[in-house]
Amino acid sequence: MNEKIFMGFVANILGIRICSIANDNASLDSFEQQNCFEKTLQPMYTAEYLHYLLENAKKEVFYEITDYLNTNLILFCFDNTCYLLGPYVKNTFSSLEMQELLASHKLPASILRPLKLYYDQFPQLSYSMIHGTVLAAMRTFIPNTPEFSYRKLTGFHE
C-alpha cells in the first residue's frame, strides 16, 4: 500500500492532518513541538506519552485521545504503520470554559487569545464521521480490513 496516497486521501476527505509516526525520539519530538500547546493541559500530546502509547497500541484499535482543552487525536496502526490523525475538535471554543480551565491549572489568562487561535485552527469533526471515513479508506486500499474497535483515552484528568 502506498502510505502517502492513503494519508492524502484521508486528509483531503476529512480536512484533517494525518501523519505516519515512528516510535523514535525525532518524530515524536516533532509531533509534540507542532501540536502541543501546553504540556500541563495536553500531557498525552507529549513525546514521552506517545512513545508509551505506541509501545502498547494494539492492532485494529482506534485510540481517541482527548486532552483538557478538548482537542482530540486518533492513533491507529494499519498495514504495519502507525498514524496520528488530528488534532481536531468536537465543539466550538468557549472562552468561559477555557478561562476556568486556565485558572484551575494556575496558568495566566494572558494565554487565552493564543489558546483560541490554536483551538480554532482545527477542524470540527465527530468521532463517528472519522471512524467511518478512515475505515472506508482503509478498505479501499486493503479490502479485507477488519472492523476496528474504539478506545477513548482521556489521560491525566483528575
Go through the PLM ranges and name each one.
Residues 1-33:
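Intrinsically disordered, low-complexity terminal regulatory regions
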Residues 31, 35-45:
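Terminal low-complexity "docking" segments
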